[in-house]
Regions:
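Hydrophobic alpha-helical transmembrane segments
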Residues: 1-6, 47-60, 76-84, 103-111, ...
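The first (N-terminal) embedded transmembrane alpha-helix
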Residues: 17-37, 109-113
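Active-site-proximal flexible loops/turns
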Residues: 24-26, 40, 75-78, 106
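Intramembrane alpha-helical segments
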Residues: 89-144
């Protein structure tokens, strides 16, 4: 598949590859933590919330894209036995709709984007000593 064809994939293909329904497993705990910080300490800043939310989404994208890349053989087997939303990945890679390198590269870009946001939150907004360590733990545990 040519590089121009990769860019012409539909928004639906990219959304399917990103698996947005499964982002709730990261977004809801982040929102709960935000609500707890507001409730217990009366701390809430909308700009920090949206930056943190963007970082969580990028970490989720990183893990899902890495899973698409590293699990293509297993996803192909899983889909041939039984197609499920919860097993076998998005189905984009086993169907051959993208070159195998695309989810790997997009995973790395998402990881770097989350890292940049983490640095901004840690050092620009001075959100505390746990911002980067928690983000790194989340990203690495999902990626590997």
């Amino acid at each position: 598949m040519k590089d121009k064809q990769i860019l012409k994939l539909t928004v639906g293909d990219w959304l399917t590859l990103s698996r947005p329904p499964f982002h709730t497993v990261g977004i809801l705990p982040f929102a709960l933590g935000t609500m707890l910080a507001w409730r217990l300490e009366q701390l809430f800043r909308l700009d920090i919330f949206f930056l943190g939310l963007a970082a969580v989404i990028l970490i989720m994208l990183c893990t899902y894209q890495a899973g698409e890349y590293f699990d293509i053989r297993e996803d192909t087997i899983s889909r041939s036995i039984y197609a499920s939303r919860f097993a076998g990945g998005s189905g984009i890679m086993p169907a051959g709709r993208l070159p195998a390198r695309v989810p790997l590269y997009s995973s790395i870009v998402a990881f770097c984007g989350a890292g940049v946001i983490g640095l901004i939150l840690q050092f620009g907004y001075q959100t505390g000593p746990y911002t980067l360590p928690l983000g790194i733990i989340g990203a690495l545990s999902g990626f590997f």
